[in-house]
Amino acid sequence: MRHCGDCTLCCKLLPVHDGVLINGKRMQGNLDKAAGERCRYQRHTGCKVYNTALMPTCCKMWNCRWLGNDDTGDLSRPDRSHYVIDIMPDYVTVVDNTTGNQQKVEVVQIWIDPKYPDAHRDPALRRWLERKGRMALVRFNSSDAIHLMPPSVASDGQWHELDGKSEGREHSLTEIVDALST
């Protein structure tokens, strides 16, 4: 079993919104921080509130993919690779424009340390994504991201980094609803 050691990268990169919704209004929890901000409970030796009543629920539920050690043997510890992998229960459908074949692909979030903006190009990470057949939403902060598509998903068998910005026309509401309902 792997251990965090002095790695606290998840405490820096992940957003933590520990407040609760009451009558549609967000009430402040004991911690509310944006992605990329250091947690106020973080110390050089780790988390000051780890396994205490003050530990935010989302931190208790966080499951570092590297710690899992089941399928990440060739990945470096997050503070050395400069990213954390967040397994999302989300999928996208990729359609081959030539054949019309559809493929349902799992998506993971990869939170990148802003000091290392090319960390998502780590060969070990790309091998892991390719082996698992997963796409990645590479998050640089709460609002900036790209999609990383491995060759096993792309119709041309190449890696693709997609910024999500469309240079073409905008889609109508009807087109969006039709696309979502298929």
Predicted region positions:
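Short loop/turn segments that flank or connect secondary-structure elements
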Residues: 1-182
